[in-house]
């Protein structure tokens, strides 16, 4: 009954984002396994470059695009936040779509074999094994230095352990060791295109993965629209530019605000929040305030949008890393290890992922070949590659090295990867079976 109620709730609250009935829902344990037809898709990828820049193109078909994100809604005299990253899709469709790429130049041992699963670990947020927030806050590095209350992606190389199965979120290497890894290039470059938090400003979000999922150097393209001291939003829409100080809740959840409308708030359409305005029930102000980024954080430019039933996005960055400590330089003739992910109106681990692949700049042996262009990248002919993406389950680095994984010895030997042992006809079902078995064993 719980499973059916969740599916009906999503459909009733936001018909445009209605999904088929999920296979399993247990929100108390961070579980949402969507229907089989919603757990697999295809991301089309093409890449080109010239003497200065590299560009990657994405096409992702969807009938339910989301360029909305979290909002403040006025209720009974208070501003209440709406929009959740999971479990599963947000019931009101108030979470952005996202397309991500992790990229490595061969310096992160194991990424070519395990892909994104090498960054997924027991205790991470949104897993059934999620660590208690207070424990993270009390950790000297994650809570003290980073100010975090959850565990996110990290490289096992940043933890101190002799046994990979025993790798733990709290065994973080000391600062000198982390600095050395970063100087040696032992980190993953992470390009995150965000339909709400970055795209309206003409950018993708430049991040990297080391001992945590970290932001690249510079100013972010989004911040939180909230004044802690006044306990109210910091900004509202400028009525002279937008026509009203807020959006309307009913219009928002009916998906009436298009890509060319003021569905996001930013430096060019905002004024300081006026608490004395005659606010009405259901007035809505975006929870994220957008701004022009700087430094390496803003190094990836984004173009395109949703058109003819698909996201059609182009991301462009200089071949040279904007900052060698958080980004990878791309060299003509070289090949790189990559892994992709797609979020559809959901956050955290509720996404679809690819197997590890290779991206080559004129390397014909790579899975995805970036073609060289003399001159303007806008004039390039594109060579598309279809990348299958699917639900990644609760497979973690620790699980892959444990007795629960039938391929444990092959993983530990380090000579064969997921693509050597699995095919996409059977792997997605195996992953779901493993998640259900782990949940059963924990009962």
Give the label of every model feature segment.
Residues 49-51, 60-64, 319-321, 342-346:
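Beta-strand elements of well-folded, non-transmembrane domains
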Residues 264-296:
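Surface-exposed, low-complexity/disordered Ser/Thr/Gly/Pro/Asn-rich loops and linkers
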